[in-house]
């Protein structure tokens, strides 16, 4: 999803993925859809593009593995991709600030429902389409923009709070964990 990667850069990317026997498709997004979305100095409107995947990607695409551009992949993602999420909107990984009560107070839901990082998402597009989640995302953006400190990540957490599958932390270990070891929930300590 892009707001305008130049044709020259598209060709460069196509050559890179071709080396690995893969293909790449570019889908242009109209930024006007995001006119009411809050942004900040380091977060652009592009962060919201994932909220409209159902409107842009072909209906034949029913599942997407979304990775932020700063994610480092060290092993095969096959086991993540093969995770059964048919009954869920998405497979998600807990955020390093999962125990921060201020997040739940700001978003106004129970800490028992958890908070996830949106940098790695296994998305069930069929579920999103059937339940019109894109509309729900924009309802939250329009109704509560002041609550959205972490932009689309907060939107996703609010809408998906009861319809997500929590996945092992090994799929998205954020750098902050290395500085805050005592804050890692004990439930994850034995994970490889």
What is each residue range found by the language model?
Residues 1-192:
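Glycosyltransferase catalytic domains, chiefly GT-A lineage
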């Amino acid at each position: 999803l892009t707001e305008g990667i130049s044709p020259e850069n598209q060709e460069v990317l196509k050559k890179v993925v071709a080396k690995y026997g893969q293909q790449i498709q570019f889908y242009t997004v109209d930024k006007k859809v995001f006119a009411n979305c809050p942004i900040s100095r380091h977060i652009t409107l592009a962060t919201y593009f994932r909220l409209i995947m159902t409107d842009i990607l072909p209906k034949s695409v029913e599942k997407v593995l979304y990775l932020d551009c700063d994610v480092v992949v060290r092993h095969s993602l096959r086991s993540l991709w093969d995770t059964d999420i048919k009954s869920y909107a998405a497979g998600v990984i807990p955020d390093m600030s999962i125990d921060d009560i201020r997040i739940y107070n700001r978003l106004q839901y129970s800490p028992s429902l958890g908070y996830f990082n949106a940098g790695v998402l296994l998305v069930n597009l069929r579920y999103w389409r059937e339940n019109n989640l894109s509309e729900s995302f924009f309802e939250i953006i329009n109704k509560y923009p002041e609550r959205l400190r972490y932009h689309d990540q907060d939107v996703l957490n609010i809408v998906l709070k009861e319809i997500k599958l929590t996945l092992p932390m090994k799929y998205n270990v954020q750098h902050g964990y290395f500085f805050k070891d005592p804050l890692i929930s004990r439930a994850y300590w034995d994970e490889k």
